[in-house]
């Protein structure tokens, strides 16, 4: 799908010392003005002091933040951002489904989408941290089936005037969940790369929201996702293929251990081209920064040097 229009989003400053009201608002305004199409927030409700679960996105398996770090709740944060933006879509990367009752989550998301006039994208996942899920009352070992049901429930709440559902984990009869989203739906991008996650994308997702996956691994995942789509008679081309990836600039080329989109401008352009050939249509960029000024400077440089090289002009809606 290399001829499709590329879109680029930015991760908001939602964790660590830069996670302040002023920084979130200033960053959101600036990124929309630069032409970025979407703004994103991650999800952790609590950070236990002892985490035995393996973090899946770095070689050490250690979660990179201490339990004393601020971590803004994503839907609350996006509601704030909705009030100071007009065009940018607002997304979760990802909302951990077992953290919230699905009817409550449906209500919160519908309210956000109502106030944002239809700009919400729901990135979802089942979560990796057993400790956090169990603290919040979830069953870690059943979280996959539970999350599948949660997705179905949210769609029922968003589309039916008298919502009703009967399943293994939840059952309710004729409830009103108003307001509903302006589109009677919110796009759901399913995260994960395990066989079950890719099956969930094919069965229940509007898109796949991959994270930090190098191109060679990504190519294999795409092949497996195509196979899952065939099993359920789903058109692969109907899925949005999206990727969350780190971003940093270097003055000299990195070596063999260089991570994608972390290198010289020429390397970053080449990385984007390779992902684009594999079908990625939307990138969520997460800057590797020292402070907020550094974070903003990275995104300014990307808009100035990289974007013109990979797409004719920022797409504004």
Predicted features along the sequence, with ranges:
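Active-site-adjacent structural elements that line small-molecule/cofactor binding pockets in enzymes
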Residues: 1-317
């Amino acid at each position: 799908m290399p001829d499709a229009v590329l879109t680029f989003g930015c991760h908001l400053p939602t964790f660590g010392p830069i996670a302040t009201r002023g920084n979130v608002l200033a960053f959101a305004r600036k990124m929309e003005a630069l032409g970025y199409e979407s703004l994103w927030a991650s999800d952790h409700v609590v950070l236990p002091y002892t985490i035995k679960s393996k973090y899946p996105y770095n070689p050490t398996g250690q979660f990179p933040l201490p339990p004393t770090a601020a971590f803004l709740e994503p839907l609350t944060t996006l509601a704030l951002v909705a009030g100071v933006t007009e065009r940018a879509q607002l997304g979760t990367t990802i909302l951990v489904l077992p953290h919230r009752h699905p009817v409550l989550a449906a209500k919160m998301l519908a309210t956000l989408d109502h106030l944002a006039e239809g700009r919400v994208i729901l990135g979802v996942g089942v979560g990796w941290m057993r400790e956090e899920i169990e603290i919040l009352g979830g069953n870690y070992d059943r979280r996959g089936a539970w999350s599948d049901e949660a997705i179905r429930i949210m769609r029922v709440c968003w589309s039916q005037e008298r919502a009703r559902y009967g399943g293994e984990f939840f059952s309710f009869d004729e409830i009103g969940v108003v307001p509903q989203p302006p589109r009677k739906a919110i796009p759901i991008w399913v995260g994960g790369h395990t066989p079950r996650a890719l099956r969930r994308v094919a069965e229940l997702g509007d898109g796949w929201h991959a994270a930090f996956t190098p191109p060679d691994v990504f190519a294999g995942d795409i092949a497996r996702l195509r196979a899952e789509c065939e099993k359920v008679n789903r058109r692969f081309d109907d899925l949005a293929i999206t990727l969350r990836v780190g971003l940093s600039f270097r003055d000299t080329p990195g070596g063999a251990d260089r991570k994608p989109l972390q290198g010289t401008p020429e390397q970053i352009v080449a990385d984007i081209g390779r992902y684009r050939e594999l079908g990625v249509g939307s990138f969520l960029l997460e800057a590797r920064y020292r402070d907020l000024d550094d974070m903003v400077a990275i995104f300014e440089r990307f808009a100035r040097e990289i974007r013109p090289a990979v797409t004719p002009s920022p797409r504004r809606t």
